[in-house]
């Protein structure tokens, strides 16, 4: 399917959700492998829930960051994905997003890396160092906004540009 899109001149971007994983209780696959490493934790040992889904991965830990980057490289090299849209990019550090872009750029200088510049709750990422910052400082990582999306596609009661409502 990806080849068919490429043959038609269409790039393929993959929607990725690295901000959290399934399993919000003790005993998740990652916690079973390396307890207390894969997720951001509160002082009492409970999961930080910046994703709004029960947990938030700790991309500030080197091997977690490597896991994310290696998996993205796999999708680009083995499946010829052209870019990635990150769910809740605000739950990932800006330096993580910049490193992701830098590594993927080495594979394809036309790579698209962008995401939602917000979180789903109070994140464990240090204020001012979120992936949202990476999407605003001209380093190749993009961010988008619901207001722009809504202006283009419209919302309930408002048609948007694609439906002839904006001049």
Regions inferred by a protein language model and the residue ranges of each:
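Aromatic- and acidic-residue-enriched carbohydrate-binding clefts of CAZyme catalytic domains
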Residues: 1-8, 22-66, 70-78
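Active-site-proximal helices and loops of the catalytic beta/alpha 8
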Residues: 6-8, 88-167
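Glycine- and acidic
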Residues: 57, 81-86
